[in-house]
A protein has these predicted regions:
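Non-globular, low-confidence helical/coil segments that flank catalytic cores
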Residues: 4-324
């Protein structure tokens, strides 16, 4: 299996954002990358976790077991989301390289010993930088990574950690479903095999718990959003994790209208170099009267669902755009 090699350029969009001011060390990934990026083989525990069908997921979702908690961990200009349903846990991204220990400690504080699912949305450092710490420190059922590689040290560290764990990464397939306790997860993207921008390789996941739903978008931009809509996926969700830290390159008018969220969450850092969240995005949310919860103003955001209603550990933030 040949994987296209891309160069990591931070989290910035090719057309909208500044290049990162931090020069990242490069590492040539050996052929062992292909061995861990395998969509057909998984560890025994992963196979046990994924033996449920869509019908079984719907049946389970009708008899909820406890609450659902979503932790948008404050990792600055980066993403890391811990999702808990009953005794089951999933982690989406793990922040920058310097956030690894922070995320590990946060998970331990929440009583996490095993992670049923880990998703590295795409190879940018601000999403997978701390992922090697997670892989090294926790027992993991299944790891999802998109079918793309990078020459960066951050990506190389993740590949090495997976290999050293004796695991293989699974390539996500749009339309695939799996259960996290009583919650049902559906993969919506990526829908193409080749993009100019690494952001559009982002794994997009919709989670349903009772009558509540959540959409996690990574750094997916308008190209990926339009592909998701063209595929006819149901993107309606109560809560939307705004793509790409609130960049103008994500959250198109059409996509936002289809999702029609009651709440929005943005993971970003005050005074970041990119001016996130951009004014265009904040104006869209303000015009639709969608409350915005943002880590740069509120710190870690914890969302709780009982399957019928959603509550937050804090009040909403402002619609103020970032300053470049």
């Amino acid at each position: 299996m040949l994987l296209s090699v891309f160069l990591l350029n931070g989290c910035a969009s090719n057309i909208a954002d500044k290049a990162s001011s931090v020069t990242k060390e490069k590492l040539q990934i050996s052929n062992s990358t292909e061995k861990v990026m395998n969509s057909d083989e998984n560890t025994k525990v992963a196979e046990e976790n994924t033996k449920t069908t869509q019908d079984e997921g719907e049946k389970t979702n009708s008899a909820l077991n406890g609450n659902l908690k979503v932790h948008f961990i404050n990792v600055g200009q980066a993403d890391s989301i811990l999702i808990q349903q009953g005794s089951k846990f999933m982690l989406i991204d793990a922040g920058n390289n310097g956030d690894g220990k922070l995320v590990v400690n946060y998970l331990l504080e929440q009583g996490v010993k095993n992670l049923d699912y880990v998703i590295g949305t795409h190879p940018h450092e601000d999403h997978i930088g701390g992922l090697d710490y997670i892989i090294n420190d926790f027992r993991i059922g299944k790891i999802y990574l998109p079918k793309v590689t990078s020459t960066t040290k951050s990506f190389g560290d993740v590949v090495a950690a997976i290999k050293n764990k004796g695991m293989k990464a699974t390539v996500p397939i749009p339309g695939e479903t799996f259960n996290l306790g009583s919650a049902k997860c559906t993969i919506l993207a990526p829908n193409s095999s080749k993009y100019k921008d690494l952001n559009n390789y982002s794994v997009v996941v919709k989670l349903e718990f009772g009558s509540n739903s959540f959409l996690f978008t990574g750094d997916a931009e308008d190209i990926s959003e339009s592909e998701i809509l063209a595929k006819g996926f149901d993107v309606k969700a109560d809560l939307l994790k705004i793509g790409h830290h609130g960049s103008r390159s994500s959250t198109s008018d059409e996509f936002l209208a289809k999702v029609n969220p009651k709440y929005a969450v943005i993971s970003t850092e005050i005074g970041n170099d990119y001016g996130h969240p951009h004014k265009e995005t904040m104006d869209k949310l303000k015009n639709k009267n969608i409350p915005v919860y943002r880590t740069d103003e509120l710190g870690t955001i914890i969302v709780t669902s009982n399957g019928k209603t959603i509550s937050f550990n804090t009040k909403p933030g402002s619609y103020t755009a970032g300053r470049p």
